[in-house]
A protein has these predicted regions:
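Local sequence-structure signature of Cys/Sec-based thiol-disulfide redox active-site neighborhoods
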Residues: 1-26
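Short, flexible active-site loop motifs that bind/organize anionic cofactors or intermediates
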Residues: 7, 36, 64
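Short helix-capping segments at alpha-helix termini
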Residues: 28-32
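Thiol-based oxidoreductase modules, predominantly thioredoxin-like and allied folds used
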Residues: 33-44
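Short Fe-S-cluster ligation motifs
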Residues: 42-55
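A short, hydrophobic beta-strand/beta-hairpin element that forms part of a small beta-sheet core
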Residues: 54-63
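N-terminal, polar/charged subdomain of small-to-medium soluble alpha/beta proteins
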Residues: 68-73
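Ser/Thr/Gly-rich flexible loops in soluble cytosolic domains mediating phosphotransfer, phosphorylation
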Residues: 78-82
């Protein structure tokens, strides 16, 4: 079975990015999923689309939340991935 993957759009020296990632990692104890971290500044098309919202948590190309971890939205999304 393929593990679900969530993507965190991040950038260097971003304290909100670090906080969102740390909070998200706590969910890996309850849900089995991978976290992919992508630096938006290395991908011009991502920076153009998402740069003002970083950090952004995505499921595929669908936004779950940005700036801060939205606990309710993450719980709902991860519950559907089971």
């Amino acid at each position: 079975m393929i593990r679900p993957r969530l993507t965190v759009l991040s950038r260097a020296y971003c304290h909100l990015c670090e906080e969102l990632l740390a909070a998200l990692k706590q969910y890996q104890g309850r849900y089995d999923f991978e976290i992919e971290v992508v630096d938006v500044d290395r991908h011009p098309h991502l920076e153009e689309k998402w740069g003002d919202k970083v950090p952004v948590l995505l499921d595929g190309d669908r936004e779950i939340c940005h700036y801060f971890l939205d606990v309710a939205a993450v719980d709902a999304r991860l519950a559907r991935m089971r």
